[in-house]
């Protein structure tokens, strides 16, 4: 009887655990990519999503300033979540968001800027390019990126913009026919006006104007998503304002601000009044103002009839006064003067005389004026000393105090996203793909000419 019970028990256990064992085996095989299903078949590469890699898996940042190191090492396979670098946003993903910018930056700045904003939900980019950005080696790469529209400053463009109604409006007239920053400001508005038309024709829902040293920080949203943020905006709101935070660099040898800067000074609008005014002097550190440059943020506007730019930071409407909402948490991260070389690059773009009188004709902000004079009249050693005193944060005790007060804050999300994109080979793959496409076209052209 005991033998019979023992045999029965073994059979019962076998019948019970065999299906469970087979189910576990099937799960393990599928998890190890031994079996493909409708989900895993699209993500069969072994690259992690941004932020999933362990510390031991992360490679240290290279310290050299070459374009190759900044764009990352090339890989044969593209980042799986970008699927061959297309990052196509289907029209049914609402709202559809676009960004317009006027830039002369190189690929080491524009590629991280573009793909970061693609990750958080931006679909289309209108890049009005000049200088380095318009050079063949840069522009031909930008033109290969889906969703990126490259607009050159041609004679035809200037003739078209000369007909703009902006020239007859009073709200911008004080900036007309002045050099340097004033000229750029007018160009930005003319470009924004053209971008509105292109965005409407493309069926966009929202438009932002950003510089390529600015990143949207959609803090407080689900999945760190700009699309989710704008989707939740009430239907009667025409425009939302992002306050800006300003980069606070802790070294004078920053090469790639987006992945080397994590500390920012918060806008006074996101601070209690007593904290802001009580620590103003220490937070300013002898500079003309609380922020080195602008403090009025940037805004996003719904694409609608009669929309117009209202300076580089706002939008307006020719027919009605827009209903505007200020966002409580989301911000624009402004990486201003985050590299020592920014002093000379800004100087080289302007032909003003380095005098206190003339710089007022060329620059709107006090810090820009002071920086231009220093960069134009000082030795490299004097410039570096000035930069360390005015821009770089080196007092650990002061940093700790202002972090505790909430004036300074650490923000890591953009750094993580961009570094993971770089380590996945996204930026270098774009460059390689563009060069291969160019070589192929040249080869085909050469072959055709032989017949």
Swiss-Prot record:
Does the UniProt entry include the keyword Glycoprotein? yes
Q: Name one GO molecular function term.
A: glycosyltransferase activity
Q: Which residues does UniProt assign to the signal peptide?
A: 1-23
Q: EC number(s) for this protein?
A: 2.4.1.-
State where it is primarily located.
Answer: secreted
State where the protein is found.
Secreted, Cell wall; Cytoplasm; Cell membrane
Query: What are its GO biological-process terms?
Result: cell differentiation; cell division; cell wall organization; cellulose biosynthetic process; response to abscisic acid
Which EC class is the enzyme in?
Answer: transferase
Describe the location of the GT92 domain by residue ranges: 109-345
Q: Give the sugar-modified residues.
A: 36, 137, 168, 441, 444
**Key words, A-Z:** Cell cycle, Cell division, Cell membrane, Cell wall, Cell wall biogenesis/degradation, Cytoplasm, Developmental protein, Differentiation, Glycoprotein, Glycosyltransferase, Growth regulation, Membrane, Secreted, Signal, Transferase
The answer on whether this UniProt entry bears the keyword Electron transport reads: no
Q: Which GO terms describe its cellular component?
A: cytoplasm; extracellular region; plant-type cell wall; plasma membrane
Family annotation (InterPro entries): Glyco_transf_92, KOBITO1-like
Q: Offer one Pfam family short name for this entry.
A: Glyco_transf_92
Show the PANTHER family listed in the entry. GLYCOSYLTRANSFERASE FAMILY 92 PROTEIN, GLYCOSYLTRANSFERASE-LIKE KOBITO 1
As for family, the record states: Belongs to the glycosyltransferase 92 family.
- State the function annotated in the UniProt record: Involved in the coordination between cell elongation and cellulose synthesis by promoting the expression of genes involved in cell elongation and cellulose synthesis. Acts as a regulator of plasmodesmatal permeability. Maybe a glycosyltransferase.
Write down what this protein is called: Glycosyltransferase-like At2g41451
Organism of origin is: Arabidopsis thaliana
């Amino acid at each position: 009887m005991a033998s019979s019970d023992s045999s029965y028990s073994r059979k019962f256990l076998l019948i019970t655990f065999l299906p469970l064992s087979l189910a576990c085996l099937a799960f393990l095989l599928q998890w190890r990519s031994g079996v493909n299903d409708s989900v895993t078949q699209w993500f069969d590469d072994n690259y992690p999503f941004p932020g999933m890699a362990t510390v031991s898996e992360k490679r240290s940042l290279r310290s050299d300033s070459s374009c190759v190191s900044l764009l990352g090492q090339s890989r044969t396979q593209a980042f799986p979540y970008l699927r061959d670098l297309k990052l196509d946003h289907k029209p049914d993903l609402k709202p559809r968001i676009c960004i317009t910018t006027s830039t002369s930056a190189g690929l080491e700045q524009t590629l991280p800027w573009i793909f970061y904003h693609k990750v958080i939900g931006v679909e289309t980019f209108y890049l009005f390019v000049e200088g380095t950005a318009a050079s063949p080696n840069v522009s031909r790469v930008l033109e290969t990126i889906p969703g990126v529209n490259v607009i050159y400053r041609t004679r035809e463009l200037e003739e078209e913009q000369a007909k703009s109604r902006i020239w007859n409006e009073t709200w911008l007239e004080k900036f007309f026919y002045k050099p340097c920053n004033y000229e750029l400001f007018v160009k930005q508005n003319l470009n924004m006006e053209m971008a509105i038309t292109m965005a409407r024709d493309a069926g966009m829902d929202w438009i932002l104007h950003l510089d390529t040293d600015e990143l949207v920080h959609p803090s407080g949203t689900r999945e760190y998503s700009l699309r989710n943020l704008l989707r939740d905006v009430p239907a009667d709101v025409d425009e939302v304002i992002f306050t800006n935070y300003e980069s606070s660099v802790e070294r004078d040898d920053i090469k790639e601000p987006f992945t080397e800067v994590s500390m920012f000074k918060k806008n006074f609008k996101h601070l209690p009044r007593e904290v802001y005014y009580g620590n103003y002097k220490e937070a300013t550190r002898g500079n003309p103002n609380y922020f080195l440059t602008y403090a009025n943020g940037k805004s996003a506007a719904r694409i609608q009839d009669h929309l117009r730019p209202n300076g580089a930071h706002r939008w307006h409407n020719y027919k009605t006064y827009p209903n505007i909402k200020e966002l409580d948490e989301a911000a624009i991260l402004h990486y201003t003067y985050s590299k020592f070389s920014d002093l000379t690059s800004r100087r080289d773009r302007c032909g003003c005389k380095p005098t206190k009188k003339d710089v007022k004709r060329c620059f709107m902000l006090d810090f820009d004026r002071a920086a231009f004079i220093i960069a134009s009249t000082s030795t490299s050693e004097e410039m570096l000393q000035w930069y360390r005193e005015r821009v770089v944060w080196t007092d650990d005790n002061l940093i700790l105090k202002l972090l505790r007060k909430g004036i300074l804050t650490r923000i890591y999300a953009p750094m993580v996203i961009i570094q993971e994109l770089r380590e996945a080979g996204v930026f270098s793959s774009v460059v390689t793909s563009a060069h291969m496409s160019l070589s192929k076209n040249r080869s085909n052209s050469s072959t055709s000419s032989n017949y």
